[in-house]
Amino acid sequence: IPLSLLQRLIRQYKIKINNKKSKANSKLNSGDVIYIYYNFQFQEKQNFKIKISKDFQNKLRKRIIFEHNDFIIINKLNGYSVQKGSKVSISLKDYYESILDTTLYIVHRLDKDTSGLMIFAKNRMAASSISKLFLLNKIHKYYLATTHKSFIKNSGMLENVNNEKKLLKLFYRKIKSFDNNYLYIIKLLTGRKHQIRLQFYLNDNPIIGDRKFTNDKKEVLLLRSIAIH
């Protein structure tokens, strides 16, 4: 069973422990019963086609930065969820599977409101290999973020912990200031959900347009994935 499917079923509350909602980090105890509400079927070939306007298809194709037999790199659109969830019926992954007519595998994530470079694997072997490279820090991700405030230091390391007591760590460097705004380049050293937005918020320097940790609903989130190598 693909890991992405299990994660989606958890988000949709279709995997339960003792018939109660579960989370990805839920712990099992002796005697627990796992319920999976999903009709598993073997399919020779999946029909990926969904209705997409020609203009939107062209827009998506133009955002394919690089295509290989084993993976693609896209310039992700702002405002689109990468995968399905309880409130997302069609994801960016679904759109690309439809126009490419192939199964795609998620190997890392970008938040819905974050734009920029993202990799999709085209087969399970590639997905496993690329995911392992991320875990071993053999692939590095860089982001640009814009804020209204400035850190005291022009560059440095931010270290925090999230609500799950997991370490958050990133390196930042200010590269430009303009109109009382500040542009930072960021390198992730750990991979946690909403990490950049959370760390900037915890250090009293929220990213412009961040609706997750602030009430900034007037502006687009100025956070972008700019490099993967």
Regions found by a protein language model. Name each.
Residues 1-229:
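RNA pseudouridine synthases
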